[in-house]
Amino acid sequence: MDALLREKSVKRQILKRSFVLAAALVCISSWSFAWEYPVIKGYGAVDPVPSAAFRPDKSIKYRVLFDITKGAETVDKVNPGLDRVARFLNVMAVSNIMPKDVELAAVIHGPATPVVLKNAIFKDKFKIDNPNEKIVKALKEAGVSLYVCGQTLVEDGFKNKWVNERIAIAVSASIVIPTYQLRGYAYLPIF
């Protein structure tokens, strides 16, 4: 009887130690994870997902138009649409497709429009620096064409001279979108 009790006790201890070891391994593996930013540093975090069965096709010339209409949750945050454009570039880069090998454009309108303001104007209106300044600069340096809807500027009471010089003013987002689609760009709405 004593031998049977000792055997059960040993099995319980082994089971407990196995559980503790498994929990420790899970914690260690989660601590070692780090997002990557191969092209747009600090924005558009990606994981390479080496086991992914579906990856970008290197034989395709990717031409994508992002339609950015959603504003950030708060004015001190980077616009999620701009971050998605950065993520697209970073995902392509971890798949060995560099910015020079893709053609990207983004049109900004609706609630997202304040991101286009020059820092001084943004600061005057919202009492903080424009958190989108750096990502706009990085996207332009990576070759992304950025547009803002002129109709939205007028509706929001924003003057053309208030727009960041890296962002072109379009007569309307409703002209940018079909023009790029007719030029063969894939349309990717960001709501």
Regions found by a protein language model. Name each.
Residues 36-46, 122-123, 128-191:
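A cross-taxonomic marker for long C-terminal extensions/tails that follow the last structured domain
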Residues 71-81, 99, 129, 170:
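Solvent-exposed, acidic/flexible segments
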